[in-house]
Amino acid sequence: MAGRATATATAAGKDRSSFAVTCSLLSQFLKEKKGGGGGLQGLGLGLRPAPAAPPAAGAGGAFRPPPTTMNLLSGLDAPAVEVEPNTADTAADELPLIKAPADQQSDESASEAAGEKAQQLTIFYGGKVVVFENFPSTKVKDLLQIVSTGDGVDKNTGTAATQSLPRPAHNSLPDLPIARRNSLHRFLEKRKGRMNANAPYQANCTAAPSKQANGDKSWLGFGQEMTIKQEI
């Protein structure tokens, strides 16, 4: 029993001595690598560096993070990006044209023909208005060509139409004072009738002053009679 105890004690002393030796060697190695590697990081153990100490607080006690810089001109160094043309336009141009079926084309032509027929034509000629319903546009063109060339137009009807047209306004101006003349003649006739009705009274009035004038001169006759009587 005593031998086993001494054996275990000697083994423990050896282990402690070997552990102390390894610790001393490690500390010596770290001191040597302190200047270049920086402690345990140079051993390749995957240890992260210790965080940097925070800067000292300002006078107010508020923490101020270190300033950061941003490179705003980094896009100038990047190569230019080539923009591809719009593929939708090219695809639309490359698509083949789809034609409508024959039945649909015939229906469209029929509808167009019906639209041409459902038109109204109004003609002003010879002071009259003539209206044609459902007159096709193709015949309108033919009619305009005929009118422009003068074919199919009777000269007698043209002259009759021009003769039947009303006179212009400047020719009818002298006819306007006729009513005034008639009213003036009526007024003069009425005035003449009044003068004829008042004519006897005017004659008596003119005779009365002559009588008064003769009466005023009658004393001259009395003087002549007195001289004649004295002579007798």
From Swiss-Prot:
Example GO BP: response to wounding
InterPro entries (alphabetical): CCT_CS (IPR018467), TIFY/JAZ (IPR040390), Tify_dom (IPR010399)
Disulphide bond pairs: none
Cellular compartments annotated: Nucleus; Cytoplasm, Cytosol
Residue ranges of the motif Jas: 177-202
Ranges of compositional bias, category Polar residues: 156-165
Gene Ontology CC: cytosol; nucleus
All copies of domain Tify, residue ranges: 114-149
Region span, Disordered: 54-73, 151-176
Post-translational modification: Ubiquitinated. Increase in jasmonoyl isoleucine (JA-Ile) levels mediates its degradation via COI1B-mediated proteasome pathway.
Principal location class: nucleus
Pfam families in the cross-refs: Jas_motif, tify
Tagged with keyword Cytoplasm: yes
Chain ranges for the short sequence motif Nuclear localization signal as given in the UniProt record: 179-186
Entry-linked PROSITE patterns: TIFY
Stated role: Repressor of jasmonate (JA) responses. Acts as a repressor of JA-induced resistance to the bacterial blight pathogen Xanthomonas oryzae pv. oryzae (Xoo). Regulates JA-induced accumulation of linalool at the transcriptional level of linalool synthase gene LIS. Linalool is important for resistance to bacterial blight pathogen Xoo.
PANTHER family to which the protein is assigned, alphabetical: PROTEIN TIFY 10C, PROTEIN TIFY 4A-RELATED-RELATED
Entry note about domains: The jas domain (177-202) is required for interaction with COI1.
Subunit structure, as described in the record: Interacts with BHLH148. Interacts with COI1B in a coronatine-dependent manner. Coronatine is an analog of jasmonoyl isoleucine (JA-Ile). Interacts with TIFY5/JAZ2, TIFY6B/JAZ4, TIFY9/JAZ5, TIFY11A, TIFY11D/JAZ12 and TIFY11G/JAZ15.
Assigned protein family: Belongs to the TIFY/JAZ family.
Annotated protein name in UniProt: Protein TIFY 10c
Species of origin: Oryza sativa subsp. indica
Lineage: Eukaryota, Viridiplantae, Streptophyta, Embryophyta, Tracheophyta
Gene this chain is encoded by: TIFY10C
